[in-house]
Amino acid sequence: MSLPYVLILFYSRTEGTQNLALHMARGVDQVDGIEPRLRTVPPVSAVSERTAPSVPDDGAVLCTKDDLIGCSGLALGSATRFGNMAAPLKYFLDTTADLWAGHHLVGKP
């Protein structure tokens, strides 16, 4: 059986937010009995369509709904755009409405 994990989900066009996510992962890794799981989301086009997800060569892999369902805790990271999170992260979260409606994320800090 695998350890419970904190899902560290981020979007970073530059390395700033990604570096913060890596530091968070190091902190989670210091706690016995839980592990970090770094995930990112694919970019979206200027017309808010999902672009074809590219599998990153290195760094965090793309997040799936199963990552959200299985996590014991969730940390989100994104640069802000006009007071909101970056569009790719918002788009991904908008696609998880079925998880919210199905109560799959209840009780996850």
Predicted segments with their positions:
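Short, intrinsically disordered, charge-balanced linker/junction segments flanking boundaries
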Residues: G107-P109
